[in-house]
Amino acid sequence: MKESDSVALQSWLSTPNTNDKTHTKADISDDLKILDDETLGRCIIANESIPKDELIMKIPKLYLLNYLNVLKHISYWNQGLNIFLKERISNYSSELFESPQDNITDLYCSIDVQQLLKLTTHQLLTLYLVLEKRRGANSFWFPLLRCLPELPEYDEIPMTWIIGSSDKRATHAKIFNLLPKEVIDESNAQLKKFFKDTTTVDSFFTSRQDLDVNVKEEEYLWAWLAINTRSLYYQNPTYLPVSTTKDKEISSITMVPFVDFVNHKCEKSNAIAKQSKSGYEVTTTAEIGEGEHVWFTYGPHNDDFLQCEYGFSTSTLENDEEDDEALTYTSFNKYNTIELTNILSKLLENPKKKMVVEWLKQTGYYGDYTIGVDDILFDFGSMDMSCAPSHRTRIAIAALIEDEKLFQFSETSQAYQCPQKLEKFYQGYNDGEYYAKTEALILSKILRKIESDLDGKLDKLTEIRNEIDEEDEQSEMKIRVVEKLIWNRKVMILSV
């Protein structure tokens, strides 16, 4: 992004729309500055110290790119949509959303309103971003569109590795298949949603062959990822159909210009963004020193999730200063886990364990088995970490250790009952000392198998690295992403 683009964005937000009689404009603190950081990307820093509880950004509703505003902009050209909004908004006038006529606005004229209102927010915004980008300077949103990342900037999101027409797609697919299973599963789920959304959106163009709107997959992907990575929570008005469907929650999103430059941490944020009556506001939750970044918090998400959704992780793995071939962590995401659900579930699939499974389901302890970080400390450049199985994982292993014949169904209580020792452990009367030794043996066997699989993947990544061209930066970047996610698991195994 050019500096001139960010300047133009702020000018756009700070200049009232000529058709707006209320002269609505954004209010952004002069103490803030957009920075294009080499490692963190676009971000916002403080020019001067900012105190706690300071309102630093106020973006009016007019500049929020969300479901309702898209409908309003299209309604200037579409009579059916104009009527729909007039019936629901008092004194509504589409004149505020006037823009130059072009082939895209001709398409807006003929869009079927009922078909449009069936879209989720993600689908509608994908459709709208693709079309508005084609309008160029004719679009009201032109300053925002110029500041959105280009498609190559999403290259670290794994789902993008097996889509598109890159001449290195075969190599990227090999690298993708070496990702941890959980990341592959999440990426495939994202791809399924992407293709479902774009198929739905594409149906708007099949009936308009007279217009040149042949949308490429890359255009859809750019728009879809922009929305997926840069949206904030936004409660839609209840009079919109999308507010009453099963997609209500996933459709409660908006894009917020300028605010979307704020970077995120898993914890220790210094600002909070929230919907307000006038639009969207950002307030500091701690003092922000001169030169410091403004941070929001993502919440308790592990690196797998962050890599899939946003294309980065919060753990930092670097070459050791004293040994170039050794790797060392300078930060580690405390929400990282080792997934054991598939392995333990397979052990429970034994027909003899049917009563055990029923008891686990009854108590709410069936599934979601992980090893997590107990404690983590960085001291003089080294990381000291301890990891342990979650309580529900320990309960499941204890249930596997017990004789399945001791699990019974009580006709009196109409409930499944477990052995007394397990009942006391489950109820929290002890810490499961009775099972500790056997639990450790089972875990050790499981973790050695996982570690062996991870080492095999690292070996294959080395083979791919040796095969690719030294100047193939795209493939090298993807290899590094996979290596880090694998090493996250390996270092946790060593810390159990």
Model-based region annotation:
Residues 1-63, 68-71, 132-496:
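Long, positively charged leader/targeting segments at protein N-termini
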Residues 65-146:
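Eukaryotic helix-linker segments that join adjacent hydrophobic helices
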